[in-house]
Regions:
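Accessory cap/linker subdomain of secreted extracellular hydrolases
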Residues: 2-185
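Extracellular/periplasmic catalytic domains that process cell-envelope and extracellular macromolecules
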Residues: 187-190
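Catalytic histidine neighborhood in serine/cysteine hydrolases
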Residues: 192, 218-234
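Short beta-strand/loop motif that positions the catalytic acidic residue
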Residues: 195-198
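Acidic catalytic loop of the alpha/beta-hydrolase fold
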Residues: 200-205
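Short, highly selective alpha-helical patches that border small-molecule cofactor pockets
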Residues: 206, 210-214
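Short N-terminal edge-element motif at the start of the domain
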Residues: 208, 238-239
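Catalytic active-site module of serine/aspartate enzymes centered on a nucleophile-bearing elbow/loop
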Residues: 239-252
Length: 252
């Protein structure tokens, strides 16, 4: 069986290096190992079943799902949010014609090549991105650590592929970090309004994560202002002017 790391074997990160007395972030490009490629393949095969188990719905109450090959109505929903981002970028005078993989009609973005968009975003983390199989671990492994144990697994997949003898954190602790357990729980106190932003170039995680949170909230009748700012990375400036307008509107 061929292995192509789901078409994206290379990843680039920005580790901090101390140069004289100034800390600079220097880009480093690497290629995933064969083993990481197999893990990527296995996780990709598992993901559609997870998405489909959430039973997410769009604005017209259509169920959003993924097919085994990663296509489907859930991906199409995310694509529509990306097109909204492109439309706003055009209004903000971005030269969107420089991207040959975007389709236009009367100078308006109407579609794009999904794989080219993924290439444009690039991969930042090797697989698995969060629950590592061994040392040195990830910040997330350490979040789930204890007073005695630095790193603990928080997924069955990470635990099954463990190389460092890390234990698996109890399920009740994992639950505390997952808002999906509480959004539909009538006993949980939720904010009345949410504003969620995920940059089009935010590679720290997938756009699927913010999309899942948005849809889960909306499916439980909680208003969400969701947008994907173009040309924006992780912790970017998500337009504070719009933020203050949103606050004003929900507090009137």
């Amino acid at each position: 069986e061929s292995l192509n790391h789901n078409g994206h074997p290379d990843f680039s990160k920005l580790p901090e290096e101390l140069r004289t007395k100034i800390v600079e972030k220097v880009p480093v490009t690497e290629t995933m190992t064969t083993q990481q490629g197999y893990l990527s393949r296995d996780l990709a095969r598992m993901y559609p079943a997870y998405i489909n188990s959430l039973k997410l719905r769009d604005e017209r109450e259509n169920t959003l799902q993924l097919n085994p090959d990663g296509t489907g109505t859930f991906r199409a929903w995310i694509a529509r949010q990306v097109i909204r981002s492109m439309e706003k970028a055009v209004l903000d005078d971005y030269n969107m014609k420089e991207y040959p993989w975007i389709d236009f009609h009367n100078d308006r973005p109407v579609g794009f090549d999904w794989e080219a968009f993924v290439d444009f975003r690039t991969r930042m983390k090797p697989t698995p991105a969060f629950d590592k199989t061994g040392e040195p671990g990830s910040p997330e492994n350490k979040v789930y650590g204890s007073q005695r144990i630095d790193n603990r697994h928080f997924t069955s997949f990470g635990y099954q592929h463990d190389k460092s003898g890390w234990p698996k954190v109890p399920a009740e602790i994992v639950k505390l970090y997952n808002p999906l357990y509480y959004i539909a729980d009538p006993r949980a106190t939720k904010a009345k309004n949410f504003r969620i932003r995920a940059g089009a170039l935010d590679r720290d995680t997938s756009l699927a994560v913010s999309s899942i949170l948005t849809l889960a909230l909306r499916n439980n009748s909680i208003p969400v202002d969701y947008f994907i700012p173009w040309d924006t990375g992780h912790a970017g400036d998500y337009d504070s002017g719009d933020l203050f307008l949103w606050v004003r509107n929900i507090t009137r």
